[in-house]
C-alpha cells in the first residue's frame, strides 16, 4: 500500500512539474511591453558619457507597428519598429524627425539611437533600447 501511495505522489509531482515547466517561457510579451505603452526617457548612455534629461520630458509611444517620440519643444521622431521577444532584438526603420536637433543633444542622441537600435532589455516597468552594450537609452513606463 505504501508503495502505491508513493507511486501516486511521484506521478502527481511529475505531472505538476511538467505543467509548470511547459507553461513557462523565456520569450518576452512584446505586446505588453511595447504596444500602447508610453515611456519617458530617464537618460542616454553613450560609452562613458551619461546624458540626463535634466527634468525635461522626452517620451516615446509605441503603437502596433509605429512609434512617435516627442521632445520638450514639441519636435517629433517617428518611425516603424519591430522586436523579437525570444532574441530581444529591436530595430527601427523609416525613422524621421521634424527637427535636426542642432541645440538639443539629448534629442539628437535619441534620434541616432533609434536609427541604430539593435536590442532591448526590460519589462513593463523599465526599458533599455540598445545600439551596443554601452550605448543605450533607459526609459521608465508611464503606466
Predicted regions located by residue number:
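Short, linear, compositionally biased motifs with a strong N-terminal bias
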Residues: 14-18
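C-terminal motif of bacterial Sec signal peptides marking the signal peptidase cleavage site
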Residues: 20-23
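Bacterial N-terminal signal peptides that target proteins for export
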Residues: 2-12
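N-terminal hydrophobic targeting signals that begin at the initiator methionine
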Residues: 1-2, 25
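Lipid interaction determinants
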Residues: 25-78, 82-143
Amino acid at each position: 500500500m505504501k508503495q502505491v501511495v508513493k507511486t501516486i505522489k511521484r506521478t502527481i509531482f511529475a505531472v505538476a512539474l511538467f505543467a509548470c515547466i511547459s507553461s513557462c517561457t523565456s520569450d518576452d510579451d512584446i505586446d505588453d511591453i511595447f504596444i500602447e505603452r508610453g515611456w519617458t526617457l530617464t537618460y542616454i548612455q553613450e560609452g562613458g558619457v551619461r546624458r540626463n534629461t535634466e527634468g525635461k520630458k522626452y517620451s516615446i509611444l509605441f503603437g502596433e507597428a509605429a512609434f512617435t517620440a516627442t521632445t520638450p519643444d514639441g519636435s517629433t521622431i517617428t518611425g516603424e519598429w519591430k522586436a523579437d521577444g525570444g532574441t530581444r532584438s529591436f530595430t527601427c526603420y523609416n525613422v524621421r524627425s521634424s527637427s535636426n536637433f542642432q541645440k538639443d543633444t539629448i534629442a539628437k542622441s535619441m534620434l541616432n539611437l533609434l536609427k541604430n537600435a539593435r536590442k532591448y532589455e526590460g519589462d513593463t516597468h523599465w526599458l533599455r533600447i540598445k545600439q551596443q552594450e554601452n550605448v543605450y537609452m533607459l526609459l521608465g513606463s508611464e503606466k
